[in-house]
Amino acid sequence: MSTDNKQSLPAITLAAIGVVYGDIGTSPLYTLRECLSGQFGFGVERDAVFGFLSLIFWLLIFVVSIKYLTFVMRADNAGEGGILTLMSLAGRNTSARTTSMLVIMGLIGGSFFYGEVVITPAISVMSAIEGLEIVAPQLDTWIVPLSIIVLTLLFMIQKHGTAMVGQLFAPIMLTWFLILAGLGLRSIIANPEVLHALNPMWAVHFFLEYKTVSFIALGAVVLSITGVEALYADMGHFGKFPIRLAWFTVVLPSLTLNYFGQGALLLKNPEAIKNPFFLLAPDWALIPLLIIAALATVIASQAVISGVFSLTRQAVRLGYLSPMRIIHTSEMESGQIYIPFVNWMLYVAVVIVIVSFEHSSNLAAAYGIAVTGTMVLTSILSTTVARQNWHWNKYFVALILIAFLCVDIPLFTANLDKLLSGGWLPLSLGTVMFIVMTTWKSERFRLLRRMHEHGNSLEAMIASLEKSPPVRVPGTAVYMSRAINVIPFALMHNLKHNKVLHERVILLTLRTEDAPYVHNVRRVQIEQLSPTFWRVVASYGWRETPNVEEVFHRCGLEGLSCRMMETSFFMSHESLILGKRPWYLRLRGKLYLLLQRNALRAPDQFEIPPNRVIELGTQVEI
């Protein structure tokens, strides 16, 4: 979606409802059921129902309304949000050592997202399909196969883009939230006593009465706020105000009414705990509700998949993941992308999770650790931005951080109890992604430093070539260079082996700035280094895709005429070998070699015609 000025506020707000709130909007399917299912040692008791409802409501108020919508969303990079954006903002005005710590926090947060994203589609779709147990109990054996079929279709359509079906997301999700509100209100009217749980003292009473068990039960309460990171991550698509407006006018009232409606039902009929959401509906509405619930969970899953694609692109462009094929599925919207490798790896992981856990209640045990871990990191990073970038009073910032952590840390600690019952899954996946990202970044830096150790001066080499030129051949040669003031390896090897040089030489560097977009005015910088040498530096934001043809067009506008099909592109292709290392660094080196072999080649990254590319190999020890 785009927040084009021509779009009206209601249209953008409706679109935000369709995308941003899919995950948190489907939480009523399973949250209260997991809270009161008996796993914590108490059943459907009045004090327990009131306590859980009070905790859920005030978590929605404090975590979503105050922390994320009011505070965290103030931290934006040209309107964009997300944990990696927060990481880069926090590290702008800090020491090198502090910046390194903040980068590690940001990468852990991003890794947690990868771990949690495998569970979200599985638990959402399964919890909707489990409505079959109410409609037709004899079909309960079909829950797993039907869940896999639905998700298979969802992952298959990713390559075609979601622009067409995406237009339906907003009205479907608006209908979903209105149904949530209607079902809840109907039940509350029948038993208005449940509204007493709006009083936060019921949450306090819950802790005093149930003591240690109540603390462990926070691991189930947190299910009500899963998906809260999407509010911040999708800020660039819709803007702050539409996301806030959607929350306070539609989403929060609907969620509150539905949770309290389920509570009212349970007070009246404790046996409804087997599936309080679907049992809110009259019998005639069960099948339509099952259908709309399935659609809502598919939309929630789609939002998560799109989020993975966006995070992966950002990590690739910032140098934390190896280059991979990224396909744009819309000519109008740069945010609509498809990454085949990520799509099918995620699909395989989701199917394995569904087959292994078999029921959404089992998956709920795996849910929450990564979410609450990311919440802790977001609190630290966002308050760092408030102190270092906004220059807020340090004591005021400290109070904000303490308030956030007083909620985040108990939630995270309570979820650690899930570690053996399924919480190991997102943590394991997150750990793998953290190792991959830190390995690629550190080993890539080591490789570039090794390649540039020759220490030859670019200016001195150009002066020498102009003074005593080798044989010059007609045409233009472009040498891709990762660093601005370093002699490209391909140039040195071409002179060493071929002993010729083109009449015109362009040293081209494509760099990614710490911003989502770069204005066209700043896209290309051209510097003539000598009569036959030019340096071209093209800058892109991490939401943009570098394109050499566009760079040539910009060069032509500034007086350096280049024609793609009359230009030879020289690139170096490194053959890497591992030097002597300790065993743990050797393992990391082998992982890097694997990533390097499977990385997208530079000509494919920058859309250079293959018949214009000349690759010169070189062996480098790292």
Swiss-Prot record:
The keyword tRNA processing does not apply. GO terms for cellular component: plasma membrane. It catalyses: K(+)(in) + H(+)(in) = K(+)(out) + H(+)(out). GO terms for molecular function: potassium ion transmembrane transporter activity; symporter activity. It is a multi-pass membrane protein. Keywords: Cell inner membrane, Cell membrane, Ion transport, Membrane, Potassium, Potassium transport, Symport, Transmembrane, Transmembrane helix, Transport. Belongs to the HAK/KUP transporter (TC 2.A.72) family. HAMAP family: Kup. This is Low affinity potassium transport system protein Kup. It comes from Escherichia coli O6:K15:H31 (strain 536 / UPEC).
